Amino acid sequence: MSQLVECVPNFSEGNNQEVIDAISRAISQTPGCVLLDVDAGPSTNRTVYTFVGQPECVVEGALHAARTASQLIDMSKHKGEHPRMGALDVCPFIPVRGVSMEECVLCAKAFGQRLAEELNVPVYLYGEAAQTPSRQTLPAIRAGEYEALPEKLKQAEWVPDFGPSSFVPSWGATVTGARKFLIAFNINLLSTKEQAHRIALNLREQGRGKDQPGRLKKVQGIGWYLEEKNLAQVSTNLLDFEVTALHTVFEEARREAQELNLPVVGSQLVGLVPLKALLDAAAFYCDKEKLFVLEEEHRIRLVVNRLGLDSLAPFDPKERIIEYLVPDSGPEQSLLDTSLRGFVREVGARSAAPGGGSVAAAVAALGAALASMVGQMTYGRRQFDHLDSTMRRLIPPFHAASAQLTSLVDADARAFAACLEAIKLPKNTPEERDRRACALQEGLRQAVAVPLKLAETVSQLWPALQELAHCGNLSCLSDLQVAAKALETGVFGAYFNVLINLKDMTDDVFKEKTHHRISSLLQEAKTQAALVLGSLEARKE
C-alpha cells in the first residue's frame, strides 16, 4: 500500500486570481505532489488548497507554496469574513493511507521548523503536534486574529514553537500541525449573519463559553454572510466526523433554523470529503426514510440531494471524494482493473500469482453476486410484492459480501508477494536470519488471514441464502444453484490455501486454532450448500 499524506494549506487570498494560480503552480510543480482541489472564497478572502503525496513530498510542496505566498500576500492589507492570523494561516498534515498520525506530526514539525528558518516568521504547532494542551485547538491559537499578534507575541504564553517572537506585518503567523480528516461543511440559510451565528453558537462544542457549551462534540462553528451568493451560512468544521457526522450537523442546524422560522436552502462542502462520511449519511437517510438503495453511486446521489450539496455549485463526486481522486494504485496494477479475459490469462501464465487464493476469492465473489442478482430479480415485481420487506433484508448482505470478496482477489496476491519478499531477504548473519524469519512469519500470517477472511465472510451468508432459496424467484433457480456451489468452492479453495501456509508457521497454538476454525468453516460450507441445493430441488418439484 502506497503512503499518502494530505496537506490542506489555507492561504489568506481569495480574490486575486494571479496569486491563487501562482500558489497552485508552486504546489503542482513540486515532484511527488498531486494538487486535488483549489477552493477560493471571495467573501472569506481565503483559498483552501488540497494536495497529496508521500510524507517528504508534501512537506516540500507546502514550503514551495509558502515561499510563493510570502512574495505575493501582504497581511497588513487583508480583510475577509474568515478568522485568520497569517498569509499562510494554517497548514495541517492528515494521514490518508499507509501513514500514522505520528508520521504526520513529524511532517508538521519539519515543515514548521523550515518555514520559520527560511522566512523568519513565527510558527505555532496545533492538533496532534501541539506541545502544550492550550495549543491543541486552532481557535485557541488564533484568538484575536492577525490584529492581536503584535501584543500577543510579547507574552511568554504565546512564544512561537518555531521562529521569532517578533511581529512580521506582511506575514503574521502560521499554524501547522497534524489532525484527522477535517470536513469543512457550511449550511445555507436565508437569514442574517447574526441569526446564522446564533445557530452556530448553539451547535459548536465551544458554545458561548465555558458555562454555555454547545451540543455537538468535535465541531467548530461560526455564522457569516456570503455576499456573492446573497445568503448566510452556518460555517462548521467537523474535527472528527466519526464523533459527529455530517448528517448530524445538517439535521441539528435545520432543527435550530426551524425554531427560528428560517429556511435552510442546502449546504456546501469546502474541499474534499472522505467517502465514508457520505456513506454514513446515506445509511442515516436510508434508515430514517426506510429506503432501499444499494449502489454506492446511488447512495452518494441520495446524500447530495438530502443535504443540498449542489445548491451553490455542481457537486461532482469524482472531483470531491478523496478516494475517487487518489486510488491506491501501489507498485503493481490491481487485478481488479484487468478485464475478465486478462484475469484468466494472468491466472494461466507461468507465474505463481494470481493463484488459487485469488481464484477462490473471485469465485466466492461471483457466488455472492449471483445471490444478490436473484434477490433483485425478485424484488420490485408485482407478483412478489408480499416479499418486498424480505428482499430488502436479504439482498444487502450479498451485495456487501460480493464487494468484500472481490477485494480479496488482490489481497491474496499481495500476501503472496509479501512472503516472496521475505524469502528474498539476506541471511548471511544471525541478525539477518532473525529479521528474515520474522518477516516470513508475518508474511505467512497475512497469507493465512486472507483466505480465512474469505471463509468467514461466506459463513455469514448461509442463513440468508437458505431463506432466499425458499422464496426467491424460481425463474432464477439455476442461478441460485450456481451461487451455492460457487460459495462452497470459494471456501474449499480458502481451506487449502490456509493449510499450505500454516505448515511453515512456527506458532503451534495459532496453527492449531486456525486449522480447527478453517476445518469447521469448510464442513459448514459443504453442509449448507447441500441444504440450499436440496431446498431448490424440492421447490422445482
Curated annotation (Swiss-Prot):
Q: Which residues form the active site?
A: H82, D412
As for family, the record states: In the C-terminal section; belongs to the cyclodeaminase/cyclohydrolase family. In the N-terminal section; belongs to the formiminotransferase family.
Phylogenetic placement of the source organism: Eukaryota, Metazoa, Chordata, Craniata, Vertebrata
Question: Pfam families in the record, alphabetically?
Answer: FTCD, FTCD_C, FTCD_N
Provide the residue span(s) of the region labelled Linker. Answer: 327-334
Please identify the protein, giving its name as recorded. Answer: Formimidoyltransferase-cyclodeaminase
Q: Which GO terms describe its molecular function?
A: folic acid binding; formimidoyltetrahydrofolate cyclodeaminase activity; glutamate formimidoyltransferase activity; microtubule binding
Q: What does the record give as EC number?
A: 2.1.2.5, 4.3.1.4
Write out the ranges of the annotated region (Cyclodeaminase/cyclohydrolase): 335-541
Q: What does this protein do?
A: Folate-dependent enzyme, that displays both transferase and deaminase activity. Serves to channel one-carbon units from formiminoglutamate to the folate pool.
Assembly and partners are described as: Homooctamer, including four polyglutamate binding sites. The subunits are arranged as a tetramer of dimers, and form a planar ring-shaped structure.
- This protein's pathway: Amino-acid degradation; L-histidine degradation into L-glutamate; L-glutamate from N-formimidoyl-L-glutamate (transferase route): step 1/1; One-carbon metabolism; tetrahydrofolate interconversion
Q: Which Gene3D superfamilies match?
A: Formiminotetrahydrofolate cyclodeaminase monomer, up-and-down helical bundle, Formiminotransferase, C-terminal subdomain, Formiminotransferase, N-terminal subdomain
The entry's localization annotation reads:
Cytoplasm, Cytoskeleton, Microtubule organizing center, Centrosome, Centriole; Golgi apparatus
The keyword Transferase is assigned to this record: yes
Modified positions (Phosphoserine) in chain numbering: S520
**What keywords does the record list, in alphabetical order?**
Cytoplasm, Cytoskeleton, Folate-binding, Golgi apparatus, Histidine metabolism, Lyase, Multifunctional enzyme, Phosphoprotein, Transferase
